[in-house]
Amino acid sequence: MHQTSMGIKMESHTLVFISILLCLYGADGNIVMTQSPKSMSMSVGERVTLTCKASENVVTYVSWYQQKPEQSPKLLIYGASNRYTGVPDRFTGSGSATDFTLTISSVQAEDLADYHCGQGYSYPYTFGGGTKLEIK
């Protein structure tokens, strides 16, 4: 009896792990969001361009998020190019169909963070693996 319940518990943990992987990396029929580069190191004042490519047409249903260390993700851009309330105008989103960019016109020290794109066109909604932005 004890072995059976342990087996069920381990199996449920495995299913949760697989579900997370499928959300992050896509499964058959899921849209995969691929970000590049994976990381970059920039100096204050430089222009930064991050890219996100969808495995199929997502029209303009793409959002960009910033996640600083030890903080929850913050919405920067929605609908591919709409800046969320309070987001500095140095952040600009563009693109449509499968190719999207997030540009920071003049990077600041406080922009140190991970940046993720996500698509809301087709369920399950999926996200890119992120770009880690470091400041020199």
UniProtKB/Swiss-Prot annotation:
Residues 118-126 are annotated as: Complementarity-determining-3. SUPFAM superfamilies: Immunoglobulin. Residues 86-117 are annotated as: Framework-3. Residues 127-136 are annotated as: Framework-4. Residues 30-52 are annotated as: Framework-1. Residues 64-78 are annotated as: Framework-2. SMART domains: IG, IGv. Pfam families: V-set. GO terms for cellular component: immunoglobulin complex. GO terms for biological process: adaptive immune response; immune response. Residues 53-63 are annotated as: Complementarity-determining-1. Gene3D superfamilies: Immunoglobulins (2.60.40.10). It comes from the Eukaryota. Keywords: Adaptive immunity, Immunity, Immunoglobulin, Signal. InterPro entries: Ig-like_dom (IPR007110), Ig-like_dom_sf (IPR036179), Ig-like_fold (IPR013783), Ig_sub (IPR003599), Ig_V-set (IPR013106), IgV_Light_Chain (IPR050150). Residues 1-29 form the signal peptide. The keyword Repeat does not apply. Residues 79-85 are annotated as: Complementarity-determining-2. This is Ig kappa chain V-V region MOPC 21. It comes from Mus musculus (Mouse).
